[in-house]
């Protein structure tokens, strides 16, 4: 099974050995949508069998955001509350909505009552703190997650409920 391989190195679309722009765009769309759905990158064990950490209902509450921060963070959570002007949000949705079936108007600055709320100041984001964002499922699975509040790095984490959502993501 070679998904997207047909045009990846297509010499009629690009130089030999160079990934085509078409393939790069499709790969970016697919990756962002996988993260939106599952909350993490694709994971495999040493035998290349898929590993599926629990899917949690996560909302980011971001201070000092901007358009770039919204673009980087939005796929990594189910909802994001961010202090940026509405026209910036609308521009992001207009640009990104054609790339996903997820309704972005239901993901940005909506009051929902998320299971887990993660609050932080975007001005304090670093490569280290971004690595936590990419691993919330693993972090929560590796600890005895309970209702309550705690801090980790730059993040204030409020756990309202502990529920797993991965079974709702598979349609048979």
Where does each model-flagged region fall?
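A short, conserved alpha-helix in the catalytic core of glycosyltransferases
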Residues: 1-3
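C-terminal, non-catalytic tails of nucleotide-sugar-dependent glycosyltransferases
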Residues: 5-68, 75-90, 95-111, 146-172
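Short, surface-exposed beta-strand/loop "edge" segments at domain boundaries and coil↔beta transitions
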Residues: 68-71, 90, 124-129
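Short, well-ordered secondary-structure micro-motifs within conserved domains or adaptor modules
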Residues: 105-141, 151, 155
């Amino acid at each position: 099974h070679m998904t997207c391989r047909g045009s990846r190195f297509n010499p009629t679309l690009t130089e030999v050995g160079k990934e085509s722009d078409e393939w790069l765009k499709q790969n970016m769309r697919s990756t962002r949508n996988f993260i939106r759905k599952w909350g993490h990158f694709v994971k495999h064990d040493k035998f290349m069998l898929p590993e599926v950490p629990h899917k949690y209902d996560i909302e980011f509450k971001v201070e000092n955001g901007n358009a770039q921060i919204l673009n980087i963070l939005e796929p990594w959570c189910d909802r994001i509350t961010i202090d940026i002007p509405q026209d910036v949000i609308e521009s992001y949705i207009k640009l990104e909505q054609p790339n996903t079936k997820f309704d972005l108007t239901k993901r940005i600055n909506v009051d929902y009552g998320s299971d887990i709320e993660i609050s932080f100041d975007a001005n304090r984001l670093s490569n280290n703190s971004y690595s936590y964002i990419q691993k919330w499922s693993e972090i929560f699975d590796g600890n005895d997650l309970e209702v309550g509040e705690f801090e980790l790095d730059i993040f204030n984490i409020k756990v309202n409920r502990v529920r797993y959502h991965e079974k709702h993501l598979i349609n048979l």
